[in-house]
Regions:
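Generic "edge-of-domain/loop-turn" microfeature
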Residues: 3-5, 17-19, 35-37, 47-54, ...
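Beta-strand-rich interaction surfaces with strong enrichment in secreted/lumenal proteins
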Residues: 13-16, 79-86
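Intrinsically disordered, low-complexity regions
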Residues: 7, 47, 51, 62-65, ...
């Protein structure tokens, strides 16, 4: 029967973010051993950036992904190598990457967020600066 859904969760923890940080990269490979192609969907189900819980602020997964593109001096992106994972052993890669160049082009934002990131990490040494939980679903089609 079609329509079966498989779900996996990716937990992303970036200890410290700061201008000039080493780029962060994490990936999850999902394979499809079934006999039916599946559609891959990813959704941010929890997001915490420097102590701000974005889900608690009422942001949707799409809001959060767009916010990562537009609202911060660092870049954080989530992508999938394909929207469809073919039957009989095909593989798809979900990638999470983050970076913060020394010169993002906006010194004021770099300074503001740099200070925030520094203070957060100093005050919360045991907590990740960025923590995400991403649900990846493979839905047979």
């Amino acid at each position: 029967g079609g329509g079966e859904t498989t779900e996996e969760y990716i937990e992303v923890n970036i200890d410290a973010i700061y201008p000039g940080m080493q780029p962060f990269y994490q990936e999850l490979k999902a394979s499809n051993d079934g006999e039916t192609d599946a559609k891959i969907i990813y959704e941010v189900v929890d997001a915490n950036v420097l102590g701000d819980n974005l889900i608690a602020k009422g942001m949707s997964s799409l809001d959060i992904i767009n916010s990562f593109k537009n609202d911060y001096p660092f870049t954080l992106s989530i992508s999938s190598s394909s929207d469809i994972i073919k039957a009989n052993g095909d593989e798809v890669t979900i990638s999470i990457s983050a970076s913060w160049d020394y010169d993002s082009g906006n010194d004021e934002e770099d300074t503001k967020w740099g200070n925030r990131a520094y203070d957060y990490h100093k005050d919360n040494p045991d907590l990740s600066s960025v923590k995400l939980l991403i649900k990846v679903s493979a839905i047979q089609i």
